[in-house]
Amino acid sequence: FGHGGLLAISILYFVLFIIVGNFFWKKDKKTPGGLLYVCAVSVIPLLVWAFECLVGIMPKELDTYNDFHIFIRQGWIMMELATISVGCIFLKYRKFPLLTLPICYSGWYLSMDIVPLCLGQAIEPTWGMRNFATVVFALLMLGYALKLDNKKQGTEDYSHWLYIFGATMLWGVIISILAQFELDNEFAYFLTAIINLAYMFISILLKRKIFMVW
């Protein structure tokens, strides 16, 4: 199809997801409608990537969309910012908590892609930089989830999904750090047990079962 074809298909999917999503939403079928809105926001990275490739903005080494989920590159930043922006617009007009999924996911990617730019280095981040960015982003997400939890109004529970994403990212980076240090098995198991106990304590303190999963 080429980049022009992918752009046209992405726009078509985006519009169809919105139209059908609106149909269900207005019929008071919030779940299918909301899921289609999530799909619409999830199309944004591909749409922006195809557009940037078509007009020649995207670097040639980023000419494969699948690399977006594999490699950390500064060239993805516009895709991530666009996804976050569109997701926030949807979230403002359609109160569906799962819309935080593409927003958080893109925010996580952005937190890693932007690190070299903040340091003034247009290079691929090291594992240490990636882990640091993930830890900071996960803690910020958990902190914001706690803030929303304390100010919870209505039936929508946005903090629930933020807790899930934040706890998952934090657990993943902890495992990554332990693997890098190549710690002795018994010591690594001990640290893992301590972290699990901390998660259990937080779960009891916040009355959130999600932390018990880990």
Identify the residue ranges that each predicted region occupies:
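Alpha-helical multi-pass membrane segments and their bilayer interfacial helix-loop junctions
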Residues: 1-214
